[in-house]
Amino acid sequence: MFYFDLYPKMVPADEISVIRIRPRFSHASFKGDVSVLVSPYDRTRPQFEPEWHLEEDGTLVVKALFESEQEHCIQVIENFGEGKERKNDFRIFSLFPDLYALRPFKGDIHLHSKRSDGREDGRYLAARYRQAGFDFMALTDHRYYEPSVEVVEYWKDINPDFKLFPGEEVHAPDNPVHIVNFGGKCSVNNMYREDEEKYRREVAEIIENLPDKEEGKDYFTVAASEWVFKRIQENGGLAVFCHPYWSIATGNYVSEWNNDEIMKRNKFDAYEIIGGFFRWQYHSNNLQVVRYYEEMSKGRRFPVVGVSDSHGADAFGFDASRAGRNTNDSFDADLFNWYYTIVFAEECTLPSLIGNIKKCNSLAVNAPAGERAELYGSFRHVRYGHFLLREYFPQLRSWCAVEGLLMQQYLAGEDTLPALKSLMGKTDSYREMCFKRSQE
């Protein structure tokens, strides 16, 4: 439960801002002899006392200059005498203009339904993802684009606040590289299915034009991957190079030489730095992270995404009263909500999300259930991202959770549409309140 409303949470750097902290319950109200101190995390100045006052309704109003781009702690000390006091720490983040103009959106763009090798209906997955606090999602079934379109069409008028986009995982013939088509206007899988001869002819042309070829190397995989990247890009999608260090029993699924060439030629749009690996496969994500930073040291910077690659949102335990699964009470499955992307964008639309991922305005989040969150991207985005995971997204999720539950009930045949419609705009309103300049 959130004891206080604090707005705004994000403010412009190097400007005077007004922060309003309102206790939501009587037991959280400010009492005793109150004092207020502000501490910039980067120690750009010593701890100081800002201008502040308490309003009649108990709201604490703090006015201060928040320097540079960093987190700030507003400490409220209540002295009750006889050595008794209570301290509450509140945190905000000041941002330079370019990042202050963008909003954080949580999404997953690589997951599967029962239409390929997943377990659940794509419409149900959308409801579960909203329940988990996601702003956007794309279903990317193996070899099939149409299931994602069906999910988009089903929910678009019922819950327009949750942004659903088309997608697919592309498996071009004789190419082991897996590639996600996020947001493309049509299916790339259908292109090679409808005319495989044309696909092979165009791949051969790419091979012919590759420079400095060596005898005996697998240029088909490189060229076939670039054929897919180009088809996705031509149709407005984001071409994602997926899990290069996924390994099976006999070794890595894609050869290291192919990984080298694909990264060196850098024709894809985004790199899956964090993919859907189970705890016992931790080495794969570790290798992908190290490889990313090694490529950066060579002057090659890839936009990054984190994805769950989940094949189901629900798992079931065993009922102690009988032998078998308790199939009426599920819990979150492994991978679901473990790995995802935070995109800093002007709005949660496909052009804005794709455009900002390409500009490297994104973070990959690695946060398996019960474990610490690790973020990957630029230093600037990572430290802002940690603040958001702690101070922003939990409250957003509380609104999304209600929507997601109502979506599930609607899908199950219950008349929850009026209740769902009554919540429309709540998450957008919360997001803007977190950035809105407060008046004294």
PLM region spans:
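Inter-heme linker and motif-flanking segments adjacent to c-type heme-binding CXXCH motifs
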Residues: T250
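Charged catalytic cores and adjacent phosphate/nucleic-acid-binding surfaces used
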Residues: M1-R103, D174-K185, Y253-E440
